[in-house]
C-alpha cells in the first residue's frame, strides 16, 4: 500500500541545493541546524497550497501544543524527525492512498465491486478531471476547451494524485446536483504565516489545543470524527447537514465533500507523470466520482481563513473570505492582516495569534516581521475556474504602544486609495460613454492596474511609518499622508489619460466628454472634502476655474 506518512512524496527545497528533493512528512525538521528545508517545491502552485495545508493539518491533528507555553518551547526547540514520525504513526491507517480498507480522502462506502458494471461506467472519469481547471463533460461535449485542452493529463503519478485529491476536497466547488462545496465554500482564500524554514511555516500556523477545541466538538474524538473516510460517509441525499458540532475540529483540514475513489495501476514501461514528469511505480488514469457527499453547514470556522460578519444576521455568523478575480494585493491588507472595521472582516486566527499573542516571543527569536502567503481558486457555478490567486505581502508587528496609531494610519492610506480608485473608474466611464449609453464596459483591468501601480509606494510608505513610530522620534504623519495623496493624485490622472483615449476600451472618443470627465476627476482629487478628511488633511481652496486652467499644465510622467 502507498502510505502518505511513510513515503517520500513531498517535493521541497533546502537552503542550499539547486534541485528539489522528496521527503516524508516527518522529515520537515530534518537538517534544521545545517541545511534546513525552506519551502515546498511542487510542480504546480495549487499543489504547494494543498501540501502546506496537509502538513499544518497533520501537525495540528497529531501533535498540537497544549497551550501557548508549549507552543513557544517547540518553536525554540523543534521536534526531531523521529519524534514527529512517532506522533504521526498513530494515524497511519488514515493515510493509505490505496488498499482494501480506508483510503485517504476517499469514500469508504463507495464499493466499486458491488456496483453494476453499467452504473459503474457512468461514474468513471479520466483522471485529469480531478484537477480543478481541467475541462469537464459539458465543456468537452460543446468543444469549448480552447485554452486548457483535454487529454493533457492522462497519466498522473500517485504523488501528484494525492496532492490533486487534497486540492479538490479543500476547494471543492459545486459540481452539479448533489456535489457539495468545501467546508469553507467554493472559492476559499487561505492565508499562511511564512517562517524562515518549512517547519517554522508549519508551526506558525498551529493553534494551541485550548483554543482549537472551540472549532469543533471535542467529545467527538474517534478517528472518523477527524478523518471522515475512516467510517461510513455522512451522505446528504436528503440535504442532511454536518455542522461543527457533528465532528472534531480537526476535520476542517480533512473535509470530504466529494465522494471519490482512486484506482492505482502499475506503470507501463517508460510511463511518466504528465504533471511532474517523473516516472513512478504506480499511475492513475481514471477515478470514480458520485454525488451527495458530506454537506458542511452551520458554524464551521477554519484557522487559516479570514471571515467577515454576515450582514443583517441575527446569529452573528461569519462567512469565509472568498478568493477574487482581480487577485490579492495591498487593498486586502484590511481583513487579511488587520481588522477591517468598514467591512467587518477578521483576519485568520493564525494571523491574529502572530500579531497579537506571539509577537513578543517571536521578536526575541528574530522574527518580528515576516510575510503572509494568500492563495486560492476563484470558481463560479458549473465548476468554472476563473483564476488561481497566489500572493505574498509583508506581515509586520509593532509594539503595543504604537499599534493603534500604526493601524489607523494604514486604514487611512488604503481607504483613500479605494476612494480615488472608485472615482477614477467612474470618470473613465464618463469619458468613453455618453449618459444615454446602455453599455456596461468591464473596467476591472483599470482597477487592477491602479492597485499594481500604487503597491510598491504603499509598502514603502508603511515601512517609513513603521520605522518612524518604532523609533519613538517625532514624526509628522501629516507630511507622510500628503506625500501619499500627491502620489495617488498623479497616478490617477496618468491612468485617466492612458485609458480614456485608449482603443482597448472603445474605438471612438469624444474630446468634450474626456475634458469634462477629467475636470470632474481633478475636482475630486484636489477638492473633495471627504477624501481630505479621510487623511486628516485640510482641503485646499481651489475654484473650478483654476482647475480648468490646470488642464493646460503638463502632468508629471509616472513610470
Language model features with spans:
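Flanking scaffold residues of small Cys/His-coordinated metal-binding clusters
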Residues: 149-152, 267-268
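Non-catalytic, well-ordered alpha-helical scaffold segments
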Residues: 154-155, 200
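Short Cys/His-rich metal-coordination motifs, predominantly Zn2+-binding knuckles/fingers
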Residues: 157-160, 276
Amino acid at each position: 500500500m502507498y502510505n502518505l506518512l511513510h513515503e517520500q512524496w513531498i517535493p521541497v527545497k533546502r537552503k542550499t541545493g539547486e534541485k528539489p528533493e522528496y521527503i516524508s512528512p516527518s522529515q520537515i525538521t530534518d537538517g534544521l541546524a545545517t541545511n534546513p528545508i525552506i519551502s515546498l517545491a511542487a510542480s504546480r502552485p495549487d499543489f504547494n497550497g494543498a501540501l502546506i495545508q496537509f502538513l499544518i493539518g497533520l501537525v495540528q491533528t497529531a501533535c498540537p501544543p497544549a497551550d501557548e507555553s508549549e507552543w513557544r518551547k517547540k518553536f525554540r526547540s523543534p521536534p526531531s524527525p523521529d519524534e514527529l514520525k512517532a506522533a504521526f504513526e498513530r494515524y497511519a491507517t488514515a493515510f493509505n492512498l490505496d488498499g482494501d480498507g480506508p483510503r485517504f480522502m476517499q469514500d469508504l462506502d463507495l464499493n466499486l465491486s458491488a456496483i453494476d458494471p453499467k452504473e459503474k461506467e457512468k461514474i468513471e472519469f479520466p483522471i485529469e478531471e480531478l484537477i480543478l481547471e481541467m475541462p469537464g463533460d459539458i465543456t468537452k461535449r460543446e468543444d469549448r476547451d480552447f485554452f486548457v485542452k483535454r487529454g493533457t493529463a492522462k497519466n498522473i503519478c500517485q504523488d501528484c494524485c494525492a496532492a490533486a485529491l487534497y486540492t479538490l476536497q479543500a476547494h471543492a466547488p459545486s459540481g452539479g446536483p448533489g456535489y457539495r462545496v468545501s467546508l469553507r465554500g467554493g472559492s476559499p482564500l487561505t492565508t499562511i504565516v511564512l517562517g524562515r524554514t518549512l517547519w517554522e511555516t508549519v508551526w506558525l500556523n498551529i493553534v494551541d489545543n485550548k483554543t482549537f477545541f472551540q472549532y469543533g466538538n471535542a467529545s467527538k474524538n474517534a478517528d472518523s470524527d477527524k478523518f471522515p473516510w475512516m467510517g461510513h460517509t455522512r451522505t446528504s441525499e436528503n440535504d442532511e447537514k454536518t455542522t461543527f458540532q457533528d465532528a472534531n475540529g480537526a476535520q476542517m483540514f480533512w473535509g470530504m465533500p466529494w465522494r471519490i475513489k482512486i484506482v492505482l495501476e502499475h506503470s507501463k514501461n517508460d510511463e511518466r507523470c504528465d504533471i511532474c514528469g517523473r516516472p513512478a511505480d504506480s499511475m492513475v488514469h481514471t477515478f470514480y466520482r458520485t454525488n451527495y457527499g458530506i454537506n458542511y453547514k452551520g458554524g464551521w470556522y477554519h484557522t487559516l481563513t479570514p471571515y467577515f460578519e454576515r450582514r443583517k444576521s441575527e446569529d452573528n455568523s461569519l462567512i469565509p473570505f472568498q478568493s477574487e478575480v482581480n487577485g490579492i494585493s495591498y487593498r486586502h491588507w484590511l481583513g487579511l492582516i488587520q481588522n477591517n472595521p468598514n467591512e467587518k472582516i477578521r483576519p485568520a486566527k493564525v494571523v491574529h495569534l502572530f500579531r497579537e499573542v506571539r509577537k513578543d516571543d517571536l521578536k526575541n527569536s528574530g522574527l518580528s516581521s515576516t510575510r503572509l502567503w494568500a492563495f486560492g481558486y476563484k470558481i463560479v457555478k458549473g465548476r468554472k475556474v476563473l483564476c488561481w490567486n497566489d500572493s505574498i505581502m509583508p506581515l509586520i508587528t509593532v509594539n503595543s504602544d504604537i499599534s493603534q496609531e500604526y493601524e489607523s494610519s494604514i486604514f487611512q492610506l488604503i481607504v483613500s486609495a479605494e476612494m480615488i480608485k472608485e472615482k477614477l473608474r467612474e470618470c473613465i466611464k464618463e469619458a468613453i460613454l455618453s449618459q444615454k449609453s446602455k453599455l456596461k464596459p468591464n473596467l476591472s483591468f483599470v482597477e487592477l492596474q491602479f492597485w499594481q501601480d500604487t503597491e510598491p509606494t504603499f509598502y514603502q510608505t508603511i515601512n517609513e511609518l513603521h520605522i518612524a513610530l518604532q523609533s519613538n522620534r517625532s514624526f509628522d504623519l501629516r507630511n507622510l499622508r500628503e506625500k501619499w495623496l500627491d502620489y495617488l493624485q498623479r497616478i490617477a490622472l496618468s491612468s485617466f489619460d492612458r485609458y480614456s483615449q485608449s482603443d482597448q476600451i472603445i474605438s471612438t472618443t469624444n474630446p468634450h466628454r474626456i475634458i469634462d470627465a477629467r475636470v470632474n476627476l481633478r475636482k475630486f482629487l484636489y477638492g473633495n472634502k471627504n477624501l481630505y478628511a479621510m487623511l486628516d488633511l485640510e482641503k485646499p481652496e481651489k475654484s473650478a476655474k483654476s482647475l480648468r486652467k490646470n488642464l493646460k499644465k503638463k502632468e508629471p510622467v509616472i513610470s
